Amino acid sequence: MKKESDSFNRIKLKNKIQGMLEDTLSKGTVSIIAWLAVTMILTVVVFSFVLVLMNLRPDNETGSLSLIEAIWQNFLRVIDPGGLQNDRLWGYRIVSAVVTLLGVLIFGALVGVLTTGLDNLFIEIRKGKTEIVKKDFTLILGWNPTIFKIISELVISNANHKNKKIVILSKNDKIKMEDEINLRINQKELLKNFYNSLDGKSHKTYQTKIYCRSGSIIDIDDLNIVHPENAESIIILSSEEDREDINTIKCILALRKKAKKIITEIKDEHNKELMDFCFQNEKNQNILYIPSEKWLSRITAQASRQPGFSVIATEILNYDNDEIYFSKIGKELIGKTFKEISLNCVTSIVLGICKKNLDKNNLKEIYQKEMAEGKLSGIQKNIILNPYEKFNNNIIDGENIGCVIEEGDELILFQSDDGYPEFHFEELKIEKFQWKSGTEDVILPKSKTLILGYNKRIYKIIDELYEYVSVDSEVHIIAKMDKEVEKHLKDNLGYENVKNEDITDYRISEKEYIEEKFNLESYESIIILGYDELETQEKDAKSMLTMLLIKKMLEKNSKSSLKEKSIVIEIYDEKNREIVELTEVSDYIISDTIISSVISQLSEEKRLYYVFDELFSGEGCEIYMFSADNYIENFDREYTFKQLSTIVANEETILLGYRDMDERVEKKNDYGVHLNVNKNKKIKLNKNDKLIVLFEGGNEKNKKKVI
């Protein structure tokens, strides 16, 4: 019985030692190195005692080695096997040989462990699971085709600032993300081309550091890798599969307590209302929802009514030329009127003002009413675009002054950089020109629009189209869609003249049918949309094929061409831009580019959201192009841009620029669009040229100008 007990105890002790050894070794490279170090020390010490006790020496000298000397000698044998050749006595040689062999084994194992440890470290680095310990960076969560445009815009925005950083977290492989970014974005070349297009001069610029990490944007542990609480702003990108905004909403819920500022695209506006309701009791609302479908629909509809509008929208939204900035007011401007500042700002367009203190009672009744209905969110934040139209009691000596500038106010500027604008104050008297309008009654025109293709934005596009045309206007659709769509359009939008001709595919072989069924010459505008269910390249290819078909059919009749017809094509990949430009189509909407430009700008200045929302939501100020002969009568002379701005200001409107219609198909001249012209520049206009203005298009008194 005692033998069995001793045997059991030995087995138990053996298992304990084995378990302890396995536990420590399983902890990784550091614990293995520690065990090898202990083994080496024990080997050196044990055999040092052997040398001392057996009185062994490497030579014939008398006297035994001290323990310290023996340890040193054995340590040298462990790290340097070549020392054996100096040993003379066989007893010492045998001990040294054993120590050396054990040392070779230990160091061999150590090298193997270190190599494996480094390999594992590199694997972990490749996995992108190491923590980000940076601060004040822009965090991008998710990955979709817009990310390259967003990064490019941020790189340009950061060009004048040191140590700017972008951190990206997505489910993609870290190395693949880095390789793709480096392949698509050459920062040095990007900045060089940007400043060459701006002023042709060389500038000292700084590149932005980009860090990629792999993980799920809805996993708390993965989010902690990038420390979202240290980010200046967070951009959430929705995937093409996330049509219901599910992952976006989950990510917002995970981040809302940590993030300083979140910018995200919301595809379904009902989700925005839901999120607003969930967070209504929170004091700090730090989330900006971009209603991409609404804004893109508005831009598409406007482009179909105003050829060239997409060029204007793109220039306003991206960093390539001028941008919108909020600028603090200098002491010299306090007490001056908005009109004075607007007309005498030489290098910038003053779009509006952000009031430090805004008495809502000073606003016109229509704006107070719209604010009560939850519209014009910008005014809720004291952001006033085109003050000429919004304030009561702003007429002094028969002149609309907009408002008086007070201490703490900020100007909303459209200019080339974020520097302080240049002012040159001087009196400029311009005889007020009577706007040419055929009638005082607002009579909306009847029009015909042809839409080729279908996606979920078609409802909003049609709704926007009918805002400035009569209800008996016709919209014809040629597309493959569900049978319920036409009924849905009529029932929900209330437009009886919306009709769909369901053609499964508009191939070249069907052009005779289309030409016979639809007289293209009878349409004022044509819109080409991509199908949601198709891949990006397939969508663009189908849309471009349709455009070529339209081009061929129009030119066959020799009555008109793409240059003269208002044709808007929606494309998704910016790389297809150059192909579209070859067709001389009047407008193209690059959906992803527009949204990525908006996201990039909002990551730098969140108040721009309220500016863009007013410009592209159809509520408040809008951008329009009017024929120059609506403002001036004498086309034999030149006008400075300041003179033109003064003439336009007399109509309670802000002049943004002009469009030279002779340049409308010239890419190098931005298709004739000239924004933020120096106030001293002289311009000679033709009757068919357009003045680009910012005004309240929704007001009844202004609608006659639009039509």
Q: What residues fall within each predicted segment?
A:
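Cytosolic regulatory regions of ion transport systems
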Residues: 1-707
